[in-house]
From Swiss-Prot:
Record organism: Xenopus laevis (African clawed frog)
Protein name from the UniProt record: Oocyte zinc finger protein XlCOF10
Residue intervals of every C2H2-type zinc finger in the record: 1-23, 29-51, 57-79, 85-107, 113-135, 141-163, 169-191
Subcellular localization: Nucleus
This protein's record includes keyword Protein biosynthesis: no
Gene Ontology CC entries for this record: nucleus
Purpose: May be involved in transcriptional regulation.
Keyword entries, A-Z: DNA-binding, Metal-binding, Nucleus, Repeat, Transcription, Transcription regulation, Zinc, Zinc-finger
UniProt-listed InterPro entries: Znf_C2H2_sf, Znf_C2H2_type
Superkingdom of the source species: Eukaryota
Taxonomic lineage of the native organism: Eukaryota, Metazoa, Chordata, Craniata, Vertebrata
Spans through the membrane: none
SUPFAM superfamilies given in the database record: beta-beta-alpha zinc fingers
């Protein structure tokens, strides 16, 4: 579709109609699809993408596309570290309103998700899903190295450190590292004041922990 006044060509007739308004001298730019008017042609052109489905504005951080620049600008705040949503109770800030809503339940005690089996209530859907596995016996997380299965993803991740050799849990006293939190907890008892043999590791001699408690 070509403009008879300047010979500029367009793929769609609607684009040609938008362009012709530049030659008409009319200050009101009207959308041929919905009739909405704009003061500037650039605003009309941006608006027209809503009808064509064209995504022109792309987020540099994640590549997500938007039809309007204002929508992209609002989205980009999530990458800038800005946290515009503030909790009126404690002043903590959040990037998204949904995060604030979840946080506020710590103040209100609201637990909207209930287990139909036990009647227990939870703050988050994810907590309920984890809990329901205790009724079904489901263990969806399987170790590809040894085949051992786990109910919770956190337990699965901790188990995998046995195979990778990754030491994540570190003793704050002597900086010794462990693949499991339970092993770190057992080790830390050797640093306690009531341990008469601090040089002995309760992880090596598990019976010592019981002796000290008695």
């Amino acid at each position: 579709f070509s403009c008879s006044q300047c010979d500029e060509s367009f793929v769609q007739r609607s684009e040609l109609e938008l362009h012709r308004q530049l030659h008409s001298g009319d200050k009101q730019f009207t959308c041929s699809e919905c009739g909405k008017c704009f003061k500037r042609f650039s605003l009309l052109k941006e608006h027209h993408r809503i009808h064509t489905g064209e995504n022109t504005f792309t987020c540099d951080e994640c590549g997500k596309c938007f039809t309007q620049k204002s929508h992209m600008t609002a989205h980009q705040k999530s990458h800038l570290g800005k946290k515009p949503f503030c909790c009126s109770e404690c002043g903590k800030h959040f990037k998204q309103n949904s995060q604030l809503v979840v946080h506020q339940r710590t103040h209100t005690g609201e637990k909207p998700f209930t287990c139909t089996e036990s009647g227990q209530w939870f703050k988050l859907q994810s907590y309920l899903t984890e809990h329901q596995k205790s009724h079904t016996g489901e263990k969806p997380f399987s170790c590809s190295d040894c085949g051992k299965c786990f109910k919770r993803h956190s337990l699965f991740i901790e188990h995998q450190r046995i195979h990778t050799g990754e030491d994540t849990f570190s003793c704050s006293v002597c900086e010794k590292t462990f693949t499991r939190r339970s092993h770190l907890t057992a080790h830390e008892k050797c640093h306690e004041e009531n341990n008469p043999f601090p040089f002995l590791n309760t992880l090596t001699f598990p019976g010592l922990a019981q002796i000290f408690e008695d």
